[in-house]
Amino acid sequence: MNALTPLSARLERSDGHALVTLARSRGAVRLRDLAQRGSAKAFLPRVEGDVPEVVFLNTSGGLTGGDRLSYRLELGAGCRATATTQTAERAYAAGAGAARVEVLHEVGRDGWLDWLPQETILFEGAALERETQISLAPGAGCLMVESVVLGRAAMGETLSRLAFRDRRSILRAGKPVLVEPLALDDRALAAAGGAAMLGGARALATLAMVGPGAEDALGPARAALGEAGVEAAASAFDGKLVLRLLAADGWPLRRQVARLLTVLRGRALPRVWQV
């Protein structure tokens, strides 16, 4: 009798990189360069008005252990643009190692970037390390949001295993003006009901505005709060506006975030964000 020896299979990992460069030319903001490979894609849909939109997309359908993903946007001096993601990002159970995501955006002098990725949904056993950095030149500003959902409440999912590290930073002339690290693991999930942790929330978001007019936006931002099921706090200081939000489910959080972004931007969200 011959014994069959199982063959070990090496799972293919996704690896993607997308870079978009915009510059002002002939009185308008235009595409200067577009480079993409692997699972990362970027496109510029037609929009009304003179503020272009850049939409990033991970064609692999989600992230798991060993995956690599990079999004980069470079805005020239005087450029204003909005960047977002095609859909929510999903991080699935990791067999070995963590998925790594790098988001690096640069905003030239007197430019402005709205970085509005859709939410990240973390599934049981996910392992994800993400670094988001926005570098501002003198006179530049940005509005950014990051939303995280712990499982799908509608499916009755409750997470107990997770390895999530997320670091968001905004720099001006190379110096940090806002740094926000977040780490969630098994121990944090076990204590998530405590007031010092998530207070039982399963969805969380941070929204930050840095640049001219940021502190003046505190009043309109607070007036836009009030979505049922969402707890929120807002503060403004040193040229920054920061809001933090918690909810028991991703949908009320998404509605609240969408309302805030619409108020702060003074115009509709990108079409892919339709709520």
Curated annotation (Swiss-Prot):
Known partners and oligomeric status: UreD, UreF and UreG form a complex that acts as a GTP-hydrolysis-dependent molecular chaperone, activating the urease apoprotein by helping to assemble the nickel containing metallocenter of UreC. The UreE protein probably delivers the nickel.
Full protein name: Urease accessory protein UreD
Function: Required for maturation of urease via the functional incorporation of the urease nickel metallocenter.
Keywords: Chaperone, Cytoplasm, Nickel insertion
Family in the record: Belongs to the UreD family.
GO CC term (a single one): cytoplasm
Record bears the keyword S-adenosyl-L-methionine: no
